[in-house]
């Protein structure tokens, strides 16, 4: 009831109250069974970007590695800004009767803010600077920000986008040039895994309650793919940065190994997306198609 305002669930509400502009009022589209448990996990897993990262141990890196790291951190921060702004658009639309979802989204915003903070700090901590913001990244993220449906946004951002980011963060952790970078992305990946779990629970529950949603989610993926039809690969500055991080240098044999590592990363991302889409409730055949349509920008 939009006339119950901010009354907690179970409270007795006097009649005659004003109508509130909550648009997310259908339980099946808002409150998945696991949300309360995920909120508790989120609260107990918060970490401090100042105290829990060993900033004093940031090393001096060779210039090519420093530049590559700055570029990677720039890309991560830019995408995490989108992951901050998109859920924020929906938080105030959630009816307070489903406060568990609102509370979880609040922890997600806190997580993303912390990630943005540490990624940008790491870009500068070794004497480097943020890198290039690619036009293709900007186009991809705008298409997320323009998504108006809560479940569609959850599927595009969380299941597909943040799910793909898990593999990117794991790759950067494996090839991190120092322990500080590895610790940053390890902690961020743990948070992102929780976000993906929430997204999967949300979409899976909504699909179980509304089979017609399968077609609408597929249509959302196809619309976004059409909007980004000219985006055929990850941004070149990011591809170069990941290659150099994996290569640990810029000599030709090392760069060749770095290229192969990035190629394997893209394959891993595709296969992992398929598994997550299947977990959400789609068939393997549908999942293969939807994964193939996902933005090369990763998020």
Which residue ranges define each predicted feature?
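Terminal targeting/low-complexity segments that flank the catalytic cores of oxidoreductases
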Residues: 1-102, 124-130, 148-152, 209-299
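Short hydrophobic/aromatic-rich motifs at helix boundaries and adjacent loops
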Residues: 56-63, 91-92, 112-113, 138-144, ...
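Alpha-helical transition-metal enzyme core signature, strongest for iron centers
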Residues: 76-84, 105-123, 155-166, 188-199, ...
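Short, glycine/acidic-rich beta->alpha junctions
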Residues: 97, 101-104, 111, 177
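Short, charged, amphipathic alpha-helical segments
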Residues: 102-106, 183-186, 215
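Active-site-proximal alpha-helical scaffolds that flank and shape metal-associated catalytic sites
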Residues: 121-193, 223
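An internal, amphipathic alpha-helical element
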Residues: 166-175, 182, 194-212, 218-237
């Amino acid at each position: 009831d939009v006339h119950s305002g901010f009354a907690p669930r179970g409270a007795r509400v006097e009649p005659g109250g004003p109508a509130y502009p909550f648009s997310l009022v259908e339980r099946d589209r808002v409150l998945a069974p696991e949300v309360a448990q995920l909120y508790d996990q989120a609260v107990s897993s918060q970490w401090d970007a100042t105290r829990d990262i060993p900033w004093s141990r940031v090393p001096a890196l060779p210039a090519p590695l420093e530049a590559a790291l700055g570029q990677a951190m720039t890309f991560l921060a830019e995408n995490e800004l989108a992951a901050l702004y998109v859920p924020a658009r929906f938080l105030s639309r959630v009816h307070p009767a489903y406060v568990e979802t609102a509370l979880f989204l609040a922890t997600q915003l806190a997580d993303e803010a912390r990630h943005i903070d540490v990624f940008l700090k790491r870009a500068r901590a070794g004497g480097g600077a943020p890198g290039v913001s690619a036009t293709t990244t900007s186009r991809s993220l705008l298409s997320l920000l323009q998504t108006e449906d809560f479940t569609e946004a959850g599927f595009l951002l969380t299941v597909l986008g943040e799910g793909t980011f898990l593999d990117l963060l794991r790759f950067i952790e494996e090839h991190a040039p120092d322990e500080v970078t590895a610790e940053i992305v390890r902690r961020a990946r743990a948070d992102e895994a929780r976000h993906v779990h929430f997204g999967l629970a949300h979409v899976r529950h909504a699909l179980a309650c509304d089979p017609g949603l399968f077609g609408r989610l597929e249509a959302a993926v196809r619309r976004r793919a059409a909007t980004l039809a000219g985006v055929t690969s990850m941004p070149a500055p990011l591809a170069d940065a990941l290659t150099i991080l994996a290569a640990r240098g810029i000599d030709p044999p090392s760069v060749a190994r770095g290229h192969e590592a990035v190629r394997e990363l893209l394959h891993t991302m595709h296969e992992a997306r398929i598994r997550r889409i299947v977990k959400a409730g789609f068939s393997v055949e549908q999942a293969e198609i939807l994964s193939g349509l996902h933005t090369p920008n990763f998020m």
